[in-house]
A protein has these predicted regions:
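Enzyme catalytic cores with a strong preference for nitrogen-chemistry domains
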Residues: 1-328, 339-355, 360, 364
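ATP/NTP phosphate-donor binding region
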Residues: 332
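Glycine-rich phosphate-binding loop and adjoining beta1-alpha1-beta2 segment
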Residues: 363-372
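Catalytic nucleophile loop
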Residues: 335
Length: 372
């Protein structure tokens, strides 16, 4: 009998572990009802990712840990279901390099009300190895990475990347579990997917909280498809959707979760900017994965960018409770495109366009604004 694996591409609301946990528990209930054996959920699915100084608030961290415990406890009533989800992990007996309580960006695997472990760490969770510290990412400021932990334990970091064994209904699979950046091998000297495969992993699983950028999905396919082919085993990539604010910019998370075969070919993928569940079957005898899904047609770059802008603006307006918009229309291209975007989102009756003539704008731009 094949193990049924589901990838839950859910919307994560940064800073609302209560709402995120409620959604996770709902997906667990649905997984139980549909006979799912392993449910994958995104990185930092409980707290969200771009939180800034909220990561330094003890009460918030304690809330996230408590909600994580609620998810773990809920698996006791879910039969054989194993739930893998991302959350912050705290070791109050240790210090981060900033002197605060140590925090890890971690993956938890829960089954029968208990946590599963690969036996290589002093913790019952998987620690993220590669902490991005560029552009919008500031992980080194908040989290302690596996490389730092390996140095502290006087161990080789390569040896700490071991598969996690999951058994359900008498069937077993060894999962090579990674957190987001751990799979972006071209950026780092340590090839985590290959290490996991060398140490016996049969199926690679990457849980991510990865924001959209231009052509990023094409890069994902190239990178993760290559990793699966090189390792010679299938790979499941689980990302979230939603918007998150790092204090400077609002980022959209496009989802695009997918499954790759051992030959690196894309087997099935989830749509952009929509909650979805991908399902796959794992044949423990053949060591192969099977999906009944289809792959979506690739979008053009312009289509991807517009979809991202529209989704991000719409979700921001919804979260802020804004249903109407006033836009100053100059007669230039910027305000015209902005007007078109918000009319598409809110409808023409909910967008007021205002042109304010002065001695500094010409009759031509005033006419163009009126025509817009």
């Amino acid at each position: 009998m094949a193990l049924k694996i589901a990838c839950g591409q859910i919307e994560i609301i940064a800073g609302r572990p209560d709402l995120n946990t409620k959604k996770i528990l709902h997906h667990m209930d649905m997984a139980c009802q549909n006979g799912i054996d392993i449910l994958l959920l995104p990185e930092l699915a409980v707290p969200g990712y771009f939180l800034g100084d909220l990561w330094e608030q003890t009460a918030f961290i304690e809330d996230c840990a408590a909600y994580g415990d609620e998810i773990i406890a809920a698996t006791e009533n879910c039969g054989e279901l194993c739930v893998i989800f991302g959350n912050i992990a705290v070791d109050n007996s240790k210090r981060n390099e900033d002197g605060r309580a140590r925090k890890y960006n971690a993956a938890f695997a829960a089954q029968h009300g208990k946590l599963l472990t690969n036996g290589t760490l002093p913790y019952d969770f998987i620690v993220k190895n590669a902490l991005p510290n560029y552009r919008e990412f500031d992980d080194n400021r908040h989290f302690y990475g596996l490389r730092q932990l390996a140095l502290e334990l006087d161990k080789q970091v390569a040896g700490l990347h071991q598969p996690l064994t999951v058994t359900a209904h008498g069937e077993t699979v060894k999962l090579g579990l990674m957190l987001c950046e751990d799979g972006w091998t071209e950026n780092y000297f340590l090839d985590v997917p290959q290490l996991l495969a060398q140490h016996g992993a049969e199926l690679l699983c990457n849980i991510s909280c990865s924001p959209f950028s231009i052509n990023k999905n094409s890069k994902r396919h190239r990178l993760f498809g290559s990793a699966a082919q090189k390792a010679g085993i299938p790979l499941i990539y689980c990302n979230n959707v939603g918007i998150q604010n790092n204090g400077k910019n609002i980022f959209t998370f496009d989802g695009c979760s997918c499954v790759y075969g051992s030959d690196g070919w894309l087997l099935t993928d989830a749509p952009m900017y929509a909650e979805a569940t991908l399902c796959a079957g794992w044949d423990s005898k053949a060591k192969a994965i099977d999906t009944s899904g289809i792959t979506s047609d690739p979008r053009s770059e312009i289509d991807e960018v517009y979809h991202s802008l529209r989704y991000g603006c719409q979700r921001f307006l919804e979260q802020a409770g804004i249903g109407k918009m006033t836009i100053g229309l100059s007669g230039g291209i910027d305000s015209a495109v902005t007007a078109a975007l918000f009319v598409d989102i809110l409808g023409p009756d909910n967008v007021l366009l205002v042109n304010m003539p002065s001695r500094y704008n010409s009759p031509m731009t005033q006419t163009i604004a009126e025509q817009t």
